[in-house]
A protein has these predicted regions:
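ATP-dependent helicase/translocase motor core
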Residues: 1-133, 142, 146-158, 182-183, ...
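AAA+/P-loop NTPase substrate/partner-engagement loops
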Residues: 138-145, 177
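Short, solvent-exposed loop/turn elements at domain surfaces
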Residues: 193-195
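Conserved motor-coupling elements within RecA-like helicase/translocase cores
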Residues: 167-184
Length: 200
């Protein structure tokens, strides 16, 4: 069992299987919500959303993370699922040759799982081959170091998350065709150095 769904007539909770019985932690029991973050407790709503097929398969197969830092399986909260799914769907539907791509943003508060959401989005895009490179840019060294550590802890054993010690290493990884160089964590400063060295 990877995910538990517990229901009463008035409430539904779902959570990843933490392993042993003494590892169950109420902090990781979540209410499923719709796209507008309205909680769904009604069993019919849960049956047609959370535990429907293919949604249940997708949640288990694509939206769980075996976190190496604490050895616990984690499942994404509903808003994380919707964010990661929307990002990867947008990338898969983008017509890259038209040159009209626009950026976007996902707004999460402190402690809401931004790093896991960004990692899962990056992983889904990388695994789908919808982009040659997936680059996670940070604006400061501490955030880059922490994000790299968490990305590596979230990654499957057959995935590699690349660090960039300097601009030259970043440029080398960007030019590389190696599958191991698909997912990269780097800084805005290193990326802008490449642009400056390239002449704009």
């Amino acid at each position: 069992v990877q995910i538990f769904v517990a229901m009463t007539p008035d409430e539904t909770l779902y959570f990843a299987n933490p392993g042993s019985w003494d590892s169950f932690n109420p902090d990781y029991y979540f209410h499923w919500a719709d796209f507008n973050n309205e909680v769904i407790n009604d069993w019919k709503g849960i049956a047609s959303n959370l535990i429907s097929i293919p949604m249940a398969h997708q949640l288990i197969g694509f939206y769980t993370v075996a976190d190496d830092t604490d050895g616990v399986l984690k499942v994404m909260r509903s808003y994380q699922y919707y964010a990661a799914s929307a990002i990867s769907d947008k990338v898969s539907k983008t017509k890259w040759g038209e040159g009209n791509q626009r950026g976007g943003f996902i707004w999460h508060t402190t402690g809401s799982g931004k790093t896991m959401t960004s990692f899962k989005s990056a992983q889904l895009i990388a695994n789908s081959n919808d982009a040659d490179k997936v680059i996670f840019l940070t604006d400061r060294i501490e955030l880059g170091t922490q994000s790299l550590k968490e990305y590596r802890a979230f990654a499957d054993e057959n995935e590699t998350v690349q660090a960039t010690e300097n601009t030259y290493v970043l440029l080398t990884k960007l030019k590389s065709n190696a599958t191991a160089d698909t997912l990269i964590v780097t800084s805005i400063q290193k990326m802008s150095n490449i642009r400056d060295e390239d002449g704009g």
